[in-house]
């Protein structure tokens, strides 16, 4: 059995006002670094990964580094795990894009499977790229546990394929910062055991701040 742990990076800078962050190389916030430590400790305690792969972007590399330190194994960059390419919308503010291209902006949030970003990717491109990443992980890590640290868009693309869901379901799958998605693959059969699991973050927040801390925002 091959186990794949899909992890989203921790919280990043540049989230207010909301932007199409995509491939903007943003650093983790202090909160994001705490989230990375929390998910790292949980992975080290619950599983024994033999490999850690990350997106080339700093927020994933930093999250992967925390997991690497906790588990005692190195990380490798896998370009197929890079965030979606928003093209001309890269790091533009939501409100400004909505004002300039209202129809396409609305389409992205209602019919994402029909959208190609100007000079960027479509969901079809993203799914093809992540499918290749999945093949590589399964080919080189038979009967092992592998960690892949990526982005909400990448994790959604993985999960849509594994759950045999249409691309129109993109927004149905929430991915919080430093969440865990656990997938087992046995003889080509897939079992998704957990999605968007953030129990480790709640426990860490309670330990640091006591009861009443609000839940982590989806950024």
PLM regions: where:
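Acidic, low-complexity terminal tails and accessory targeting/binding regions
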Residues: 2, 73, 84-98, 139-144, ...
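Active-site-proximal alpha-helix that buttresses catalytic centers in soluble enzyme cores
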Residues: 2, 8-73, 77
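Active-site metal-binding loops of divalent metal-dependent hydrolases
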Residues: 10, 152, 198
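Short, active-site-adjacent cap segments at secondary-structure transitions
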Residues: 13, 59-61, 83-85, 154-156
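Amphipathic, non-transmembrane alpha-helical scaffold segments
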Residues: 29, 33, 57, 98, ...
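Short glycine/proline- and acidic residue-enriched helix-loop micro-motifs
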Residues: 104-125, 218
